């Protein structure tokens, strides 16, 4: 495969923490825990960029600002794990890689659509049957945290009700519906 060699064990020449599986087009990522012999398996991915993003999330969680990242300009958009447990780091890394893959697919699909839009407008028999690709908008628009945010909202106490005065109706007008029929 281009970009790897047998001499370096399948490691990617550009991305840290990424290597290619033997006899496969899949890329894997793992990271060693600081000051421990343990490794955290981050997953198997279809592209080296997805594996590199997963590595970045884990490196940032484990090493903080001292981490050497593959994509240092994307630090602000990377998800942070909920805790320092390997399972949470794996989940955050997988989420970031999936979001990167979905965003990449959306960009490729948009580019393909813009290139064919001129032809499609001229061809009246064109239909959208070639649009069979799936794009997970939840990952593209950072929606995995929506349920957690909604749950946090449920923990808030509701606003206090205002004191209801019997002389005023719900709209704040005196005398209920009498204001409709009071003419000077």
Curated annotation (Swiss-Prot):
GO MF entries: DNA binding; DNA-binding transcription factor activity
Pfam families attached to this UniProt entry: AP2
Main subcellular localisation: nucleus
This protein's GO CC annotations: nucleus
Gene Ontology annotations of biological process type: defense response to fungus; ethylene-activated signaling pathway
Region (Disordered): 1-21
The protein's name in its UniProt record: Ethylene-responsive transcription factor ERF024
Species of origin: Arabidopsis thaliana (Mouse-ear cress)
Gene coding for it: ERF024
